[in-house]
UniProtKB/Swiss-Prot annotation:
Keywords: DNA recombination, DNA-binding, Transcription, Transcription regulation, Translation regulation. It comes from Idiomarina loihiensis (strain ATCC BAA-735 / DSM 15497 / L2-TR). The keyword Transcription regulation applies. GO terms for cellular component: cytosol. This protein is one of the two subunits of integration host factor, a specific DNA-binding protein that functions in genetic recombination as well as in transcriptional and translational control. This is Integration host factor subunit alpha. Belongs to the bacterial histone-like protein family. GO terms for biological process: DNA recombination; positive regulation of metabolic process; regulation of DNA-templated transcription; regulation of translation. Heterodimer of an alpha and a beta chain. GO terms for molecular function: DNA binding; structural constituent of chromatin.
């Protein structure tokens, strides 16, 4: 099971009493701000949670798994996430729900 944006909006509705529409907008805007900051080349640091960063991966050699032929893997930008210490330890020590 995965936590979705709709479920996050539902939590805001249940916990804080904001309207369902406002909760949906808040969740969408939150993730949009993260995306825009990353597009501008900024790091996103969420205290107690972790850091998002846009990194550039250089071109590198690769191999076609079917033919074994060497092919270049083109340079690209990737989003990385590094969890914070508090977040990491809480998740590592959490008991999974059934």
């Amino acid at each position: 099971m995965a936590l979705t944006k709709a479920e996050l909006a539902e939590v805001l509705f249940d916990k804080y009493g904001v309207s369902k529409q406002d909760a949906k907008v808040l969740v969408e805007d939150f993730f949009e701000e993260i995306r825009v900051a990353l597009e501008r080349g900024e790091q996103v640091k969420l205290s107690g949670f972790g850091n998002f960063e846009l990194r550039t991966k250089n071109q590198r050699p690769g191999r076609n798994p079917k033919t074994g032929e060497e092919i270049p893997i083109s340079a690209r930008r990737v989003v990385t996430f590094k969890p914070g210490q508090k977040f990491k330890s809480r998740v590592e020590n959490a008991e999974p729900e059934d």
